[in-house]
């Protein structure tokens, strides 16, 4: 804002500039907002954790609406694979910290908003000192451990949490830890051993964009205490979205705060001191143990260059691609037959050498273990780094996705 610009004082002593009157005028015409609501937005501070597919639209609409301060927390950098859904970032920003890329975009969108960046991933050691500076927190991450960590921290600091997720064609949204409502751990007390991700299962850009936009909307409602989000009148609910179904939206009531919850129940087991000083013990007491796949023995793995030689010299080897059919249809190597991981149990008569490949060398290891149990007579092995390794080591023109 130009320091020479004339300041107009509102009736309650807070200030809006001429630019802000012009900028926010269309939403100030709404009876639900008006000048008091706009001033409430200007007084507010919001932390967005994750500057990706959810965070990008959420930040855009919150900054455009005129919140006072925005915090952006993300330790990742912009990658080309992000750009179809993370619409704040651009081709020229590849390799730049997402938080910096977002700040540049948002400062140009609305220079009246104070924007702070945190170029780090959320952890038990840094999250408390950051969240306590803000009024509302948005969880825009796609990591299960981080979701529990953010929720637990918000509970201990008394901050409301607007959480959303999106995968494939579906999304969900919920406000946690508000007016004695449930926290994330109340709803999902036990972490799921295997969690799908956008990188593995896919995501349609407008789906995650819709959910991020809804996070911004629910945050505005929360700040203004309107439309069912009034203090002491809040009835917890979850919004469910499916892009290709009719109706697309479902609004469901959710259970209240749980007495048995380790984070917010009367006998809670968590404290700030414990979480900050004992991160390993925190993951244990909260039943979160990251699932780490045990690597196959080196004798059961070959490089992409070794695979090239096998394709050229060993036509009698059985070549299996254990990706899903839709991925197999995107790109494939010659000689490989598509048998998805879910169907490898049907292969019980294999013999000789069997080479297994997948997208990046993880699913193929699981497939090899299953096939070894079913076919102890066969010599079964996989390709390190899968098709990504093939593109890196053998054929740079092979498409990655």
UniProtKB/Swiss-Prot annotation:
Domain (Rhodanese) ranges: 313-399
Pfam families the UniProt entry points to: Rhodanese, ThiF
Gene Ontology MF, one: ATP binding
UniProt entry tagged with the keyword Transferase: yes
GO biological process: cellular response to oxidative stress; protein urmylation; tRNA wobble position uridine thiolation
Record: active site: 198, 358
Job description of the protein: Plays a central role in 2-thiolation of mcm(5)S(2)U at tRNA wobble positions of cytosolic tRNA(Lys), tRNA(Glu) and tRNA(Gln). Acts by mediating the C-terminal thiocarboxylation of sulfur carrier URM1. Its N-terminus first activates URM1 as acyl-adenylate (-COAMP), then the persulfide sulfur on the catalytic cysteine is transferred to URM1 to form thiocarboxylation (-COSH) of its C-terminus. The reaction probably involves hydrogen sulfide that is generated from the persulfide intermediate and that acts as a nucleophile towards URM1. Subsequently, a transient disulfide bond is formed.
Full protein name: Adenylyltransferase and sulfurtransferase uba4
Native species: Schizosaccharomyces pombe (strain 972 / ATCC 24843) (Fission yeast)
Lineage of the organism: Eukaryota, Fungi, Dikarya, Ascomycota, Taphrinomycotina
Gene that specifies this protein: uba4
């Amino acid at each position: 804002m130009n320091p020479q610009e004339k300041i107009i004082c509102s009736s309650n002593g807070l200030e809006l500039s001429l630019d802000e009157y012009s900028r926010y005028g269309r939403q100030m015409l709404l009876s639900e907002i008006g000048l008091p609501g706009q001033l409430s937005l200007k007084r507010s501070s919001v932390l967005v954790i994750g500057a990706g597919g959810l965070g990008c639209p959420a930040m855009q609409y919150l900054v455009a609406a005129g919140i006072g301060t925005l915090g952006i927390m993300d330790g990742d950098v912009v990658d080309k694979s992000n750009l179809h859904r993370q619409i704040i970032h651009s081709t020229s920003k590849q390799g730049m910290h997402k938080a910096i890329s977002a700040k540049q975009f948002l400062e140009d969108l609305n220079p009246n908003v104070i924007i702070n960046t945190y170029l780090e991933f959320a952890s038990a050691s840094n999250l408390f000192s950051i969240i306590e500076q803000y009024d509302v927190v948005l969880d825009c991450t796609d990591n299960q451990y981080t979701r529990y960590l953010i929720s637990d921290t918000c509970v201990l600091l008394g901050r409301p949490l607007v959480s959303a997720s999106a995968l494939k064609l579906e999304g969900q949204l919920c406000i946690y830890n508000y007016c004695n409502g449930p926290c994330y751990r109340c709803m999902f007390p036990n972490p799921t051993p295997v969690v799908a991700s956008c990188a593995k299962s896919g995501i349609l850009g407008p789906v995650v964009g819709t959910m991020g936009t809804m996070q911004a909307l629910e945050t505005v409602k929360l700040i203004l205490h309107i439309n069912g989000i009034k203090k002491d009148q809040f009835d917890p609910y979850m919004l469910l979205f499916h892009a290709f179904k009719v109706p697309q939206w479902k609004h469901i009531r959710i259970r209240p705060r749980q007495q048995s919850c380790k984070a917010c129940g009367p006998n809670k087991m968590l404290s700030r001191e414990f979480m900050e000083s004992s991160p390993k013990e925190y993951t244990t007491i909260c039943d979160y143990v990251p699932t780490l796949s045990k690597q196959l023995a080196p004798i059961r793995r070959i490089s992409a260059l070794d695979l090239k030689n096998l394709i050229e010299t060993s036509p009698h080897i059985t070549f299996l691609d254990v990706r899903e059919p839709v991925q197999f249809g995107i790109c494939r190597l010659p000689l490989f037959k598509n048998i998805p991981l879910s169907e490898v149990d049907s292969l019980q008569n294999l013999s000789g050498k069997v080479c297994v490949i997948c997208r990046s060398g993880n699913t193929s290891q699981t497939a090899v273990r299953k096939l070894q149990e079913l076919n102890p007579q066969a010599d079964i092995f996989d390709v390190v780094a899968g098709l990504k390794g093939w593109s890196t080591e053998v054929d740079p023109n092979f498409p990655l996705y």
